[in-house]
Amino acid sequence: MEEVVRFECRDSNLEIYVVQPGERLSIFGSCSFLCLAGNASINDYNLPAVSCESSNFMKISAPQRMDVPAILQVFKSGPSYKHARLKFRLKEVAPKNYEKIMEMIGTTEPSVFIFSKILDFAEETVSGVVSNFLIHSSIQKQIILPPHFFISRDDFIIYPQQQEAQLKSQMNRLNKLRNDGQRTTILPIGHKGAGKSNLMRSLVNRCLSNGYEHVYVLDCDIGQSEFTPCGCLSLTKVTSPILGKPHGHQRASFENSFFYGDITVRDINLYMDIFERLFNKFKVISEPGSVCIINSMGWVTDEGAEILDGITRVTDPELFVEIFRDQTEARYQFLNRAEHNIVEIFANNSIGVIGLPPQKRLPAALIRELTIVGYFSSRLPRPSLASFPKVAPYKLRFENVTICVPVDLLVEDSHVFSSINTQIMALCINNTDLKPRKLYGKDDLPSICVIDGNSPALQCIGFGIIRGVSVEERIIFVVTPVDLLKLEEPPVLVRGMRIQTPTMFYTADPYNRCPYVLNDLEQGNSDNTLDGLYQPSVNTTQFKRSRRF
């Protein structure tokens, strides 16, 4: 890369890159970076020129196994370029090279970046469970360790130029509405695999770059959630650009989130009820001039189209952005198409890194599992799932706990603890409309509640994994990033459909230690009512586990 020059810094984990205007770079892998000088953007977010301080670094996450790179573009700078300020900043980070760099720059106005090789905790944890996740192994051999990212000059453009211009024009129109204090809504739409999630992130970054101070994401993609593990609808205020994948920016606890309890919509009425609650919440808590970007599902036909029709009626978006990659895929049929502002984008497909064999894209189920790993990574003592058994769990006393189970997963009272042991559970706020009963009718045992079509929507504050159950101590052990000590009352434990603890939690430990506590009743317990109430799960091999009841 003759136009991209690299220099070493005083800190061996940092590198300086000098990139000339007009360059367009693709970045695969993960790293942190900042812009010392120049006019540049990353994934449609305009980068500020800042000093080299730890708080100014922004994380990029563009795993090669997830196909689409981060796009770094450099433009002409204009009169705001400060050579003297750049020299001062370079002297701080590269005292041995700053004069050489400034001599090379001369009177030109390139963008100057500092890249950090250090992975953040969540990224390192996730990259350890999927081979060739960040970058291909053949690239790793070409890079001085640690090989976490790779910069190429592939001129990859996601959105064609004409459609890019249309999108910019529409964003400028919305910006005028913002200046008038009007709240606006943007609805990106796309079939499965079209790149809708990347489009949603791009729209967030564009809004932040266009002067929006109040950007909200209403995430209703229960199968591929952005800020929570799957199964939730949520409203999140975004204050910084989204430059990574969901596993890297999970929130520990949620302020405005409801647990739908599945990765696909089986009850449209409940789904739309939750959606309307969250959109009404946006209208109540958002500031004048705010924008709400809706992360819809990649489902545009049949029931998916019915849901999009409902979302359109509730929100009346000021802008629709439809993205598609495959002309043979069915597309959404808009209601009253002529009345809407619609930008259609036929997106380009990423070809990966030139010269390397194409890698199979990760399946949706694995992406969901990686999001769960990223969510719990903040509780790990080190960035490896093998350290999960060392995480100290919270203790919840039986009499204070309510367990909610979908009707399809209901078991006999004697098997309740076995059915939730090791499972991931949504932590929800108690709702007076729930109709719980005590296990065996005993006050010192948990309450059990069946979730069916008549159950209320439950507000979700986070997720936890049942670490174990002690019938003797009357305690359930839960591992969660949520600070349960700050709650006024214990959360309701809610199990979802098709939302399970990832298998990698069981196989990551080379010593094959079970990731849960094993407690059993003492033989000859005087209370025969509890006999057989709990039998521990048994880890039979590193790759298979079975349950004994």
Curated annotation (Swiss-Prot):
This is Polynucleotide 5'-hydroxyl-kinase nol-9. Polynucleotide 5'-kinase involved in rRNA processing. ATP binds at residues 190-197. GO terms for cellular component: nucleolus; nucleus. The keyword Transferase applies. One of its GO terms (biological process) is cleavage in ITS2 between 5.8S rRNA and LSU-rRNA of tricistronic rRNA transcript (SSU-rRNA, 5.8S rRNA, LSU-rRNA). The keyword Protein transport does not apply. Its main location: nucleus. Belongs to the Clp1 family. NOL9/GRC3 subfamily. Keywords: ATP-binding, Kinase, Nucleotide-binding, Nucleus, rRNA processing, Transferase. GO terms for molecular function: ATP binding; polynucleotide 5'-hydroxyl-kinase activity. Pfam families: CLP1_P, NOL9_C. It comes from Caenorhabditis elegans. Its EC number is 2.7.1.-. It is found in: Nucleus, Nucleolus.
